């Protein structure tokens, strides 16, 4: 409350000094100071008065001028009103604005002086995206204007570039740059580009399939437009014409989104569209259809709250980045409604639904505030600063959650979480860890129940990601591209993951289910299963032994016969983010029924992965190099191994894999493992009720087992 009271005080003070503080050129053709008589004005979009509810409290003077036909002074009065109105956008910090070096780089390039170089997703002409020094592609035409049809060579078929260039992603960084520096070039560039864009792509009437007015494009533009207006509204460069054009743009964007809803009713796209509609209804109550927008949008948001998340709180597309985005959208809607006195009109269970969703992020991120590349996550975007920003929002939303506060403050306040085994059985995410600090060990197991085969989800049921003391040892493949084609299919294929496959084929089904999750003396155990193929089911049991190492037991059982079963491990990258892992990997080789590989980092943070097969029919091993992707159009080389065994009729193929973190010399490490629930004569027998085995690490034997309640 103190924050919003301070905002009110600031706004009142700003109104009193806004005409004297700056000496700028206007981004229109009118001196802002109101005159008692008629004001000459060119380029005024008088249609703004047809979309305003002139009976709205505070617009009396505007209405009087309109009734007298004096639209020039009506527009000046409207601007004065807008600068003092009691409507607040909590997404904007006007009291203490800040801009990062990276944002300033974006803002500077998106100007005439910067050759109209616009940020479009991760696409750059030079430099690495997100580095803060990258150079974006220029949209400058020969006459110095903006050429919105620009498509750089090589990006003609890049679907994400062709769509995201219509989201105008530089607007918010540019507004923040203006708020901090008060340099005229930023507001001038923003307004010039905005008018140019809307002239090139006027709002359609009714339905359209044009990319610039479909899907996320208009919703993202509108959400950002609503977030830049508070930064500019008190500038002497912001004219009545500018306000009129912005209000008409808001109206046209909302109406176009309403006329062109995205076809899939529970996707992240429809949520962003509804967020734009309901937010416009809150932030622009003076517009004639604001009531409709809020009513329609809030009802849709209530439905989306239930549709977007599964019962256990995980986003229905099973992707960490889209989960993060959906939670952020819902929190933004809630806070905007809250600060403007509309929160009572949202569903009563709104915050509790979000509490579960926020809890998933708390549990799925690695202890160094990073994520894996599961599905389309693109871990390069999930930086520590991004994750902390979202965790702080969660902590503010749920101040009673002491564990969230601990994470959000990097341990400065709150209570360190104690959970070591966490399950999300409806969706199929599981975490096994020995702590919550950077030097901890953590494994994520992914076995989704996804009968709809969501587009952002990959057929990787059973895969694992492994983090040890700041290093990802088994980074997920990632997606590499959003384009339909062989590259996307390659990275999404099952064999690109740490799983068991049949003849290297991708899974036919994603029907993961949890069979067991329990703590027992000396270890934790997690057992899941997926009927991956019509004739083969894959069961995976993961033991976390002595909070030290993992043992993975894979059993492939079913009717298929005389078919190779593959145990795939996709290994680590190098020490640097985009460095090959080949120079840090030793394939120790295949011997008898086992395959061993280990890492060779020079910081005493290494791992051994040794796999054993119970049966040896046509047994063999392969290894080579491949890639994983942390970001669109980037890939990192790594090694992989594959242990192959033929499955015989009436038998199962069973593997034991030991994942042993170690420091010191590799030569001093020893790992052995064997099943103890079969004899040599009964090898390959599947026991549906459970499994028993013995693992010996560095001379210390450990008996492991689980039993299911049949």
Range-by-range predicted roles:
Residues 1-4, 18:
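Positively charged n-region of N-terminal signal peptides that target proteins for export
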Residues 267, 480-710:
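CBM-like, beta-strand-rich accessory domains located in the C-terminal region of large
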Residues 474-478:
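Catalytic Cys-His active-site segments of thiol-dependent hydrolases/isopeptidases
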Residues 15-35:
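Bacterial Sec-dependent N-terminal signal peptides
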Residues 53-151, 158-164:
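Extended, charge-enriched "interface" segments that sit outside catalytic cores
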Residues 314-473, 520, 648-654, 671-710:
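Carbohydrate-active enzyme catalytic cores, enriched for enzymes
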Residues 4-13:
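Sec-dependent N-terminal signal peptides
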Residues 143-358, 364-365, 541:
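Aromatic-lined, polymer-binding surfaces characteristic
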């Amino acid at each position: 409350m103190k924050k919003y009271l301070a905002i009110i005080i600031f706004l009142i003070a700003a109104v009193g000094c806004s005409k004297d503080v700056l000496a700028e050129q206007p981004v229109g053709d009118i001196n802002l100071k109101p005159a008692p008589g008629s004001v000459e004005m060119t380029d005024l979009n008088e249609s703004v008065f047809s979309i305003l509810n002139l009976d709205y409290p505070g617009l009396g003077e505007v209405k009087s001028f309109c009734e007298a036909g004096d639209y020039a002074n009506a527009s000046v009065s409207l601007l004065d009103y807008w600068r003092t109105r009691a409507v607040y956008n909590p997404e904007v910090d006007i009291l203490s604005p800040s801009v990062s070096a990276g944002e300033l780089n974006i803002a500077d390039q998106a100007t005439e002086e910067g050759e109209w170089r616009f940020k479009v997703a991760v696409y750059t002409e030079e430099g690495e995206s997100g580095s803060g020094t990258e150079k974006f592609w220029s949209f400058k035409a020969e006459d110095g204007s903006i050429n919105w049809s620009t498509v750089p060579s090589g990006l003609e078929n890049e679907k994400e570039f062709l769509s995201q260039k219509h989201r105008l992603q530089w607007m918010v960084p540019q507004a923040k740059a203006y708020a901090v520096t008060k340099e005229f070039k930023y507001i001038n560039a923003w307004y010039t580009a905005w008018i140019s864009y809307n002239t090139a792509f006027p709002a359609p009437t009714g339905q359209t399939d044009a990319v610039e007015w479909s899907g996320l494009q208009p919703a993202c533009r509108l959400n950002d437009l609503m977030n830049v207006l508070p930064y500019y509204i008190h500038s002497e460069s912001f004219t009545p014409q500018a306000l009129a054009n912005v209000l008409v743009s808001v109206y046209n964007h909302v109406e176009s989104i309403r006329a062109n809803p995205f076809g899939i009713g529970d996707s992240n796209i429809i949520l962003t569209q509804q967020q734009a509609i309901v937010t416009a209804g809150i932030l622009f109550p003076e517009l004639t259809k604001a009531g409709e927008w809020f009513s329609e949008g809030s009802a849709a948001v209530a439905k989306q709250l239930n549709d977007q998340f599964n019962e256990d709180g995980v986003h229905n597309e099973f992707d960490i980045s889209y989960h993060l985005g959906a939670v952020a959208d819902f929190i933004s809607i809630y806070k905007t409604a809250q600060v403007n006195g509309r929160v009572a009109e949202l569903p009563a269970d709104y915050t509790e639904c979000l509490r579960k969703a926020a809890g998933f992020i708390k549990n799925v991120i690695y202890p160094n505030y990073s994520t894996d590349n599961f599905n389309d996550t693109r871990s390069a975007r999930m930086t520590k600063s991004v994750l902390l920003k979202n965790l702080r929002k969660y902590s503010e939303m749920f101040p009673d959650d002491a564990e969230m506060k601990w994470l959000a403050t990097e341990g400065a306040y709150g209570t360190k979480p104690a959970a070591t085994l966490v399950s999300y059985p409806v969706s199929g995410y599981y975490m096994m860890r020995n702590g919550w600090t950077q030097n901890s060990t953590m494994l994520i197991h992914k076995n989704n129940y996804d009968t709809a085969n969501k587009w952002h989800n990959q057929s990787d049921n059973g895969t694992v990601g492994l983090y040890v003391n700041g290093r990802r040892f088994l980074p997920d493949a990632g997606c590499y591209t959003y384009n339909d084609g062989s590259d996307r299919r390659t990275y999404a294929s099952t064999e690109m993951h740490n799983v068991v496959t049949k003849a290297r084929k991708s899974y036919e089904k994603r029907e993961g289910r949890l069979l067991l999750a329990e703590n027992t003396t000396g270890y934790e155990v997690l057992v899941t299963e997926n009927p991956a193929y019509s004739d083969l089911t894959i069961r995976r049991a993961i033991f976390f032994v002595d909070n030290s190492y993992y043992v993975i037991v894979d059993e492939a059982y079913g009717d298929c016969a005389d078919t190779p079963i593959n145990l795939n491990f996709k290994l680590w990258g190098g020490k640097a983010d985009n460095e090959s892992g080949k120079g840090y990997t030793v394939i120790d080789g295949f011997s008898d029924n086992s395959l061993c590989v280990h890492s060779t980092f020079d910081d005493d943070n290494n791992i051994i992965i040794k796999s054993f097969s119970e049966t040896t029919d046509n047994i063999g091993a392969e290894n080579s190099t491949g890639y994983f992707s942390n970001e669109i159009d980037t890939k990192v080389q790594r090694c992989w191994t594959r242990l192959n065994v033929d499955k015989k009729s009436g038998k199962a193929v069973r593997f034991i894999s030991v994942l042993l973190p170690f420091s010191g010399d590799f030569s001093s490490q020893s790992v052995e493992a064997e099943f103890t629930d079969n004899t040599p004569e009964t090898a390959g027998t599947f026991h549906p009720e459970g499994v028993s085995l013995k693992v010996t690490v560095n001379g210390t034997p450990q008996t492991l087992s689980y039993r299911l309640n049949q």
